[in-house]
């Protein structure tokens, strides 16, 4: 997890490989180890996801955003996952087959088309509390809910 409180002021930094010594992250500082920064982009619980050169950010209270992973440029800003309703997220998003998946604490799995356009494809319902990030192993996806463990494979 990011370790940041979701107060809208926590940054995301992209650090270049091979950086050495003290990396200066102070506002306005210039450090060649920092590729780019987004000053207000960090979630609290979910980790960010880089997939096909895009950085996807899922925020704890139901917003989803996308940035160019190489430059930090905003592709699309915070979009509410569910219109007019707060949707809590603890688990981190994952990607597979040109899709990005976001599993809410309510047990709803939001399936987005991966890419530069915000496009919700479907919502799959588990109808049970989900707090853990799904695991992947040996060609299967494992989803743990409050009372069940699902294994999904082709």
Regions found by a protein language model. Name each.
Residues 1-154:
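Noncatalytic, solvent-exposed loop/strand surfaces
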């Amino acid at each position: 997890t990011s370790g940041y409180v979701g107060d809208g002021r926590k940054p995301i930094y992209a650090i270049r490989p091979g950086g050495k010594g003290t990396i200066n992250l102070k506002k306005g500082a210039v450090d060649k180890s920092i590729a780019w920064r987004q000053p207000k982009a960090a979630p609290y619980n979910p980790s960010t996801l880089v997939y096909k050169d895009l950085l996807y950010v899922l925020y704890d209270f139901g917003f989803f955003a996308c940035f160019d992973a190489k430059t930090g440029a905003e592709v699309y800003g915070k979009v509410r996952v569910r219109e007019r309703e707060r949707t809590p997220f603890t688990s981190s998003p994952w990607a597979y087959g040109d899709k990005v998946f976001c599993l809410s604490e309510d047990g709803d799995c939001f399936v987005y088309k991966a890419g530069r356009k915000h496009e919700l494809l479907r919502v799959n319902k588990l109808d049970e509390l989900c707090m853990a990030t799904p695991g992947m192993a040996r060609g299967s996806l494992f989803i743990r809910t409050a009372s069940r463990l699902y294994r999904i494979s082709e």
